[in-house]
Amino acid sequence: SYGYDEKSAGGISVPGPMGPSGPRGLPGPPGPGPQGFQGPPGEPGEPGSGPMGPRGPPGPPGKNGDDGEAGKPGRPGERGPPGPQGARGLPGTAGLPGMKGHRGFSGLDGAKGDAGPAGPKGEPGSPGENGAPGQMGPRGLPGERGRPGASGPAGARGNDGATGAAGPPGPTGPAGPPGFPGAVGAKGEAGPQGARGSEGPQGVRGEPGPPGPAGAAGPAGNPGADGQPGAKGANGAPGIAGAPGFPGARGPSGPQGPSGPPGPKGNSGEPGAPGNKGDTGAKGEPGPTGIQGPPGPAGEEGKRGARGEPGPTGLPGPPGERGGPGSRGFPGADGVAGPKGPAGERGSPGPAGPKGSPGEAGRPGEAGLPGAKGLTGSPGSPGPDGKTGPPGPAGQDGRPGPPGPPGARGQAGVMGFPGPKGAAGEPGKAGERGVPGPPGAVGPAGKDGEAGAQGPPGPAGPAGERGEQGPAGSPGFQGLPGPAGPPGEAGKPGEQGVPGDLGAPGPSGARGERGFPGERGVQGPPGPAGPRGSNGAPGGAPGSQGAPGLQGMPGERGAAGLPGPKGDRGDAGPKGTDGAPGKDGVRGLTGPIGPPGPAGAPGDKGESGPSGPAGPTGARGAPGDRGEPGPPGPAGFAGPPGADGQPGAKGEPGDAGAKGDAGPPGPAGPTGPPGPIGNVGAPGPKGARGSAGPPGATGFPGAAGRVGPPGPSGNAGPPGPPGPVGKEGGKGPRGETGPAGEKGSPGADGPAGAPGTPGPQGISGQRGVVGLPGQRGERGFPGLPGPSGEPGKQGPSGSSGERGPPGPVGPPGLAGPPGESGREGPGAEGSPGRGKNGDRGETGPAGPAGPAGPAGARGPAGPQGPRGDKGETGEQGDRGIKGHRGFSGLQGPAGPPGSPGEQGPSGASGPAGPRGPPGSAGSPGKDGLNGLPGPIGPPGPRGRTGDAGPVGPPGPPGPPGPPGPP
């Protein structure tokens, strides 16, 4: 409201001094700024090779990842005219996240249904109010079994990589679209009434003119200049917790550990059931939080405008560090093998089993039939939320905006004529309101009056029209990242669930993806040399190829041997061929939901960052409600009219005067004729101060005053109380899928798993037709010496053939069983003659194995023979008896930490989880610096007239004035 100090200076109303700034208003609720989206998760690494370990029990659920960083707040949108309630618009950018609330209890996993066809997009409905969070229902039964996926060999998880240094701040992103205007803030308390100004110097007394008629009540004086803007309000209390962020990006993969030497190759066993997923690693430390940008100047609280278009997706937050490896679960029971189900999606690799002790080199058995696919295990329940990280450091206030242009100056009123000083009469009755007269000229400033007592604050005026929106400020620089907060405490592990019934076997599925090749076994030691056989009798002509033999009966299965001691680690061999796909494991039961973790302690307050550039100019504030007219003050006696004096110095504002008692109304005097205008006389003596006259009628509003320059910024006031908790917002729409990241580097090969027990040997298939000789292979390792056969009869020497090109040495053959001793034939004595090559003798029975001879020199390569025809496939033998399950091997030592891999492509954003209960209010932030005041708006309606101050003491009489003209 505008304060007035009306003085008896020829009936002219003089504006009084401006009052002091009002107190700081209460903080408004948090505005709906954008909420940042979590970065995309990285692509899973390549699964390592190794046999499948035994299935362990479901481990305790891991902790959830951290929320993403908040996006930049949007600029305030322009205020639109109030219209009817329309349909719900597109979602706007989310606001800055508040303190993270406690996570609600997770529901049990329901049955996974088949994806239906996408329906047409319906029009968005109007938002309904959020209901109160329901109580947690009873635990449901386990969901239906999902389609089994092909399980790859489990690779060992590498250790966490070293924490990377914080990167340089990224470039400043483009300014988001205008956000929605915040809710109307709480009504500020009225400031104290300004002190009464000191009186100006006494004007020169004019000669009394003829008595003029009683003029009508003059119009109200011009409104005073706008008061200085009040100090900036304290920061509002943190808003209620935002919705949980999307899952964070997957951490970088560790460096590939060195491959250990492979052990000797054991017998091929049946694929074991896939192991359970290990415990989730400990929660990584959250990434550094950026310094909050400078807040813009407070905008005017206007009516809610139309909903704006959604803003661009926020930048993805930095990926969190990869958690440490979880502890290995206990082995579970064997699942019942069902028929092979359809090929499912590729499952995540299970943990690698420990490396077993090398056993003795066994004979290579025939490949057994692939086992049936097992049932897929049910996913584990999500773990409790981690503790809330410490709040980031408070950002500095933005730079003040430029002052607004001054308003137009109002018209000056016409100066009225001074009337003669009449005798002090009895106070008359209050007259009726007269016709408004012409505006009078501005009189000289009087002396500063004494400070009156403070009056009661007037009620707030009605809201004025909204001003034009100021120009947008330049975006601030991105702040440096703050220090990383302490890691949250790990949640308590959940209790183990009750095992459920086995599901029905699934339908037969397609063949799974090809597994990674296993490690090549170490060559076994050579066998002992047998005794040299005696010379056999000369054989006859070679016989024709015999008919294929009948298939032998399968032998009885031998008893399982005890596990041997752990052997030394062998040298690394080449990569072996791909193994058969393993069976899917039986679906595990969903474990109970663990309790939510305790809330973390708030972190230390961060230091203020450098001052950012000026924020956007705030919108014009709403003018206050028009105050009600105050009670009329006591009427004073009119003093002698004074001449125009020099304006006095601006006095210090005094306290408002106390309200005086109203005098009795006096009778209205007759209206006299107007007198002639007299010359301005010499200043007369100052008359005694008259008593208060009757209250004047309320004048019409005066012309608008000139807008004064903006005042200096006030000191920051104390922080206000936290605002009320806002109504819980509706569930936000699903965010857009983030950009695909770069493919990460393959993970390190895990340690080899424990070898399984050898399975029974299957029935031998029928012998295939002998194919044509194939291409001669390269020279292999020298084989064990075969048994020496009986020597053939010496034939005549043939003519020597041409020497062919040297051929590659073929692979060594396995040692055959010792043959029976051949019959000794008669030897031909005498000097050997050179004869022709005789016919090839018949092959004699194999003799006993002779001693191993030294390896011969590599012969010349022979010509390449034609490629042999593919032999017929033998009949499939009966499935062998399932072997005993091997004992679990010891846990191998952890490998060295791996180097971080590249960022993988982001997966599709998951649906937003259920909103948790609101968290407790955080500690208030540090008061920011005051911004420059915004442009001054047009003057509001005239406020109520202040109460009259107490009557001052009479002044000294002035000097007599000169006589007037006749």
Curated annotation (Swiss-Prot):
<feature type="modified residue" description="4-hydroxyproline">
    <location>
        <position position="61"/>
    </location>
</feature>
<keyword id="KW-0272">Extracellular matrix</keyword>
<feature type="modified residue" description="4-hydroxyproline">
    <location>
        <position position="97"/>
    </location>
</feature>
<feature type="modified residue" description="4-hydroxyproline">
    <location>
        <position position="773"/>
    </location>
</feature>
<feature type="compositionally biased region" description="Basic and acidic residues">
    <location>
        <begin position="867"/>
        <end position="881"/>
    </location>
</feature>
<feature type="modified residue" description="4-hydroxyproline">
    <location>
        <position position="418"/>
    </location>
</feature>
<feature type="modified residue" description="4-hydroxyproline">
    <location>
        <position position="181"/>
    </location>
</feature>
<feature type="compositionally biased region" description="Low complexity">
    <location>
        <begin position="148"/>
        <end position="166"/>
    </location>
</feature>
<feature type="modified residue" description="4-hydroxyproline">
    <location>
        <position position="832"/>
    </location>
</feature>
<dbReference type="InterPro" id="IPR008160">
    <property type="entry name" value="Collagen"/>
</dbReference>
<feature type="modified residue" description="4-hydroxyproline">
    <location>
        <position position="538"/>
    </location>
</feature>
<feature type="modified residue" description="4-hydroxyproline">
    <location>
        <position position="47"/>
    </location>
</feature>
<feature type="compositionally biased region" description="Low complexity">
    <location>
        <begin position="214"/>
        <end position="253"/>
    </location>
</feature>
<keyword id="KW-0964">Secreted</keyword>
<feature type="modified residue" description="4-hydroxyproline">
    <location>
        <position position="563"/>
    </location>
</feature>
<feature type="modified residue" description="4-hydroxyproline">
    <location>
        <position position="900"/>
    </location>
</feature>
<feature type="modified residue" description="5-hydroxylysine">
    <location>
        <position position="686"/>
    </location>
</feature>
<feature type="compositionally biased region" description="Low complexity">
    <location>
        <begin position="635"/>
        <end position="662"/>
    </location>
</feature>
<feature type="region of interest" description="Disordered">
    <location>
        <begin position="1"/>
        <end position="966"/>
    </location>
</feature>
<feature type="modified residue" description="4-hydroxyproline">
    <location>
        <position position="957"/>
    </location>
</feature>
<feature type="modified residue" description="4-hydroxyproline">
    <location>
        <position position="629"/>
    </location>
</feature>
<feature type="modified residue" description="4-hydroxyproline">
    <location>
        <position position="665"/>
    </location>
</feature>
<feature type="modified residue" description="4-hydroxyproline">
    <location>
        <position position="382"/>
    </location>
</feature>
<feature type="compositionally biased region" description="Low complexity">
    <location>
        <begin position="373"/>
        <end position="399"/>
    </location>
</feature>
<feature type="modified residue" description="4-hydroxyproline">
    <location>
        <position position="818"/>
    </location>
</feature>
<feature type="modified residue" description="4-hydroxyproline">
    <location>
        <position position="271"/>
    </location>
</feature>
<feature type="modified residue" description="4-hydroxyproline">
    <location>
        <position position="641"/>
    </location>
</feature>
<feature type="compositionally biased region" description="Low complexity">
    <location>
        <begin position="852"/>
        <end position="866"/>
    </location>
</feature>
<feature type="modified residue" description="4-hydroxyproline">
    <location>
        <position position="44"/>
    </location>
</feature>
<feature type="modified residue" description="4-hydroxyproline">
    <location>
        <position position="406"/>
    </location>
</feature>
<comment type="function">
    <text>Type I collagen is a member of group I collagen (fibrillar forming collagen).</text>
</comment>
<feature type="modified residue" description="4-hydroxyproline">
    <location>
        <position position="701"/>
    </location>
</feature>
<feature type="modified residue" description="4-hydroxyproline">
    <location>
        <position position="548"/>
    </location>
</feature>
<feature type="modified residue" description="Phosphoserine">
    <location>
        <position position="8"/>
    </location>
</feature>
<feature type="modified residue" description="5-hydroxylysine; alternate">
    <location>
        <position position="100"/>
    </location>
</feature>
<feature type="modified residue" description="4-hydroxyproline">
    <location>
        <position position="127"/>
    </location>
</feature>
<feature type="modified residue" description="4-hydroxyproline">
    <location>
        <position position="169"/>
    </location>
</feature>
<feature type="modified residue" description="4-hydroxyproline">
    <location>
        <position position="722"/>
    </location>
</feature>
<feature type="compositionally biased region" description="Low complexity">
    <location>
        <begin position="608"/>
        <end position="622"/>
    </location>
</feature>
<feature type="modified residue" description="4-hydroxyproline">
    <location>
        <position position="526"/>
    </location>
</feature>
<feature type="modified residue" description="4-hydroxyproline">
    <location>
        <position position="487"/>
    </location>
</feature>
<feature type="compositionally biased region" description="Pro residues">
    <location>
        <begin position="805"/>
        <end position="815"/>
    </location>
</feature>
